[in-house]
Amino acid sequence: MPSMRILSWNVNGLRAIYKKGFVDWLMIDRPDVLCLQEIKATEDQIPKELNGLPGYISFFSPGARKGRDGVALFTKIKTLSLEYSLGLPGFDDEQRAIVADYGDFLLFNVYFPNGKASKERLSYKMRFYDLFLDLMDRLVAEGRDIVICGDVNTAHKEIDLARPKPNEKISGFLPEERAWIDRLIEHGFLDTFRLFHPEGEKYSFWDMKTRA
């Protein structure tokens, strides 16, 4: 399989980054595949230019909740197939995923649920986690190679956020959330960000409300 450069970015609003030179950046950086999360745009709010960028095929899964969620995929390489759901009963209605089959591997671009709003949302998030890992296990058992891009809405270790202690009892850094990432790694997946950035002060988690 030829090498590919895949980028993942939670943009916290597609329209906002579009106004700040997103297209210019993409045309200069030119990754083979770009996965965006939390695009926060309905279908009619997606800038038309993004559907015809030179050298890229674009796919959008706008969030079902207005102004929230949603993912996008920009790819230079044609996919064999593409799905806008994970096939998880009761969890696909928020439109959090794009699944692209490149033949040699499956690419999952996922915006995982946030559990901060309530105990119910935390429970929803943890159930989503469990079902997602079950899905990964089934696909690996079938012989598929998998790349997961996205925002899991959890900081794995203290090195991943600026102020770990104040966040220990807040969703996003709870022991049970962090333990799920441990399980994901135990099941054979690699944290590629930490693979390339093992040093401190290279944070993989940022909360817009707590600013850390």
Regions found by a protein language model. Name each.
Residues 40, 48-115:
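Structured beta-strand-rich core segments of catalytic domains in phosphoester-bond hydrolases
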Residues 4-12, 104-116, 149:
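Active-site-proximal beta-strand elements of phosphoester/diester hydrolases
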Residues 1-53, 57, 63-71, 84:
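N-terminal, active-site-proximal structural segment of metallo-dependent hydrolase catalytic domains
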Residues 87-88, 113-129, 165-169:
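Surface-exposed cleft-lining segments at the edges of enzyme active sites
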Residues 15, 43-45, 67-68, 116-119, ...:
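Short catalytic/ligand-binding loop motif for oxyanion handling, primarily in non-cytosolic enzymes
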Residues 54-57, 130-212:
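Metal-dependent phosphoesterases centered on the DNase I-like endonuclease/exonuclease/phosphatase
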Residues 10, 26-44, 107, 136-158, ...:
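Active-site beta-strand/loop signature of hydrolases that rely on acidic residues for catalysis
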Residues 84, 90, 100, 126-140:
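Internal catalytic-core helix/loop-beta-alpha segment
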